[in-house]
Amino acid sequence: MNFETVIGLEVHVELKTNSKIFSSAPAHFGAEPNTNTTVVDLGMPGVLPVLNKRAVEFGMKAAMAINCEIAEHTKFDRKNYFYPDNPKAYQISQFDKPIGEHGWIEIEVGGKKKKIGITRLHLEEDAGKNTHTSHGYSLVDINRQGTPLIEIVSEPDIRSAEEAYAYLEKLKSIIQYTGVSDVKMEEGSMRCDANISIRPIGQEEFGVKTELKNLNSFNNVRKGIEYEEKRQAEVLKSGGIIEQETRRFEEATGKTSLMRIKEGSDDYRYFPEPDLVDLFIDDAWKERIRAEIPELPDKRQIRYINDLGLPAYDAMVLTLTKEMSDFFEATLAAGADAKQASNWLMGEVSAYLNAEQKELHETGLTPENLAGMIKLIEAGTISSKIAKKVFRELAQNGGDAEQLVKDKGLVQISDEGALRTIISEILDNNEQSIVDFKNGKDRAVGFLVGQVMKATKGQANPPMVNKLLLEEMNKR
């Protein structure tokens, strides 16, 4: 029996506000444990929450960016559960009246585009963080408690691990462009749970789903889904049944393990938050927030293709992160050719960032010095080979490309007289290569070009070397 996989993703994104959603405590990552907290976060008797307007506006902006309808009337609810990192024993969330509904984003997998529906986007507060020690006790940090979150719930439209990966990449890119979050999974500002079920191909009814947690990277989302597909298929083929449960992805083994039997919404005993009034969003407020949304990646891609003449693949890669796309645009503004700038950013720059595990702003590279280097290549001042050395120096230490080339003596040798002298000396010392060339062995030319480049430390103008080398050999 062959099965079809059905996947829905729940993505939590921390909003980049200065303070928490219901208290005045700072909402910044990385502080000492239990320093970013107030009596509201600790759930002390008699304290009242105050809604952070900026968090609401960030939620509206994110919802609009993923094509959600914004609610005119929304409210907050209490989600009741007990856990050490939840001092109040309830979480303030949204249940039946979320701030955004009925959205979608478009993904592309294997050259095919597909719309993935968004059921809802709602606001809520984050919980604290437990750290389990090897001494039999746990440490609780309340810093994260009360940090504003949006939860984005997809429709069960995803059919493979690859589609899930593409959805997360696209969602991260869109949220990043809006500026409402850093969406850094390594810092916990973007987290994902996956609901996975399988059903016989052709069956309309959904199978029993399992919820998968502890997915701390896009790769782990993919691996977790792939494992769970196989596990559920093996259970059904052996005559077993799938239980509705929550499972943990174990990164060390690549497998999933049981955490708990899955709760339903009734288990949380939702009821309206009595300490917060309902929220009404009028058209004027919506339009003001909509006007703040910048150009999003899909529109930017189209502009790069139509206005700059870039291939679709280049446009997609350049717009995947806002930092890269903004850097590209600033490089063009500094005078660089669009295709050359694209090639450098997608090639040498991306390779350097991956190898060094850095982001652009953490290097010495600027749009101005990258554009300056590209202009030196176009002017013939430096070769592409020398440009790679210049790039690494700029990336590591910054500075001006033209001044660096002068200081390091890296100017390309394009003087015909100087090159002829060098070529003549090399030909005098490699007479057999001349014989080989005249006998039709083209490899001899490559060898001699290499000797010239070696003698000039890679600074000779390659096209000119080829031209002069052929001229000099034909004279002999």
Swiss-Prot record:
One of its GO terms (biological process) is glutaminyl-tRNAGln biosynthesis via transamidation. This is Aspartyl/glutamyl-tRNA(Asn/Gln) amidotransferase subunit B. Heterotrimer of A, B and C subunits. The gene is gatB. It comes from Listeria monocytogenes serotype 4a (strain HCC23). InterPro entries: Asn/Gln-tRNA_amidoTrfase_suB/E, Asn/Gln-tRNA_Trfase_suB/E_cat, Asn/Gln_amidotransferase, Asn/Gln_tRNA_amidoTrase-B-like, GatB, GatB_C_1, GatB_Yqey_C_2, Gln-tRNA_amidoTrfase_suB_CS. It catalyses: L-glutamyl-tRNA(Gln) + L-glutamine + ATP + H2O = L-glutaminyl-tRNA(Gln) + L-glutamate + ADP + phosphate + H(+); L-aspartyl-tRNA(Asn) + L-glutamine + ATP + H2O = L-asparaginyl-tRNA(Asn) + L-glutamate + ADP + phosphate + 2 H(+). Its EC number is 6.3.5.-. It comes from the Bacteria.
